[in-house]
Amino acid sequence: MNSSLQISKKRKFVADGVFHAELNELFTREFNKDEGYSGVELKTSPGLTEIIIRASKTQAVVGPNARRIQELCSLVQKRFNFKEGTVVLFAEKILNRGLCAVAQAESLKLKLLAGLPVRKACYAIVHQIMTRGAKGCEVIVSGKLRAQRAKSMKFRDGYMIKSGQPSKDFIDFACRHVLLRQGTLGVKVAIMLPYDETRKIHGACNIPQPDVVVIRDA
């Protein structure tokens, strides 16, 4: 009984992951750079599936009189065999793109597709991330960059945590693939989020680092 339950849980996790990947691929093809698409989030409950589309220009995602998002909702219901009325789409605005790894990975992808040199594109992304208040960042581009042999280029700045629970709390990570004429490039963006207990900085982490000591005057 326990083994069958475990298998069903594994199948559910795999099915959810495949559904998320297919949704992300669908929206990536549907939206161009004008909407600033930066990923999708799923919230499932019995009888209802909420799909949150993250973008920098939500008005372009919704469309006039919410027509575009309604068409997308019906498209998702038909393509993934959902019953009518069981899927709801929302558009969420990204207020601080500099601290969103998905947004920066998509921006780097568009720069590379436009023919910008890898070093120039990556340094522009690193500069944009650090000027928005990040404590550190790392951009990795791997694949056939110039020569026939594949290689990896890393661009770092600031302070980065690589292991432990703080790496899960403070690091925002995104991975994308760029199809170019010479081959496919892999793009990885990792951002070390700043700590903000007042929650005034959009995209910052409100969990204090365990190794940081704050001295307050009595």
From Swiss-Prot:
Gene Ontology, cellular component aspect: cytosolic small ribosomal subunit; extracellular matrix; nucleus; phagocytic vesicle
Family annotation (InterPro entries): KH_dom-like_a/b, KH_dom_type_2, KH_sf_prok-type, Ribosomal_S3_C_sf, Ribosomal_uS3_C, Ribosomal_uS3_euk/arc
Designated name of the protein: Small ribosomal subunit protein uS3
GO molecular function, one term: structural constituent of ribosome
Gene Ontology biological process terms from the UniProt entry: translation
Keyword RNA-binding among record annotations: yes
Entry keyword set: Acetylation, Ribonucleoprotein, Ribosomal protein, RNA-binding
Residues recorded as bearing N-acetylmethionine in the entry: M1
Record lineage: Eukaryota, Amoebozoa, Evosea, Eumycetozoa, Dictyostelia
NCBIfam families, per the entry: uS3_euk_arch
Family statement drawn from the similarity comment of this UniProt entry: Belongs to the universal ribosomal protein uS3 family.
Gene name tied to this protein: rps3
Organism expressing this protein natively: Dictyostelium discoideum
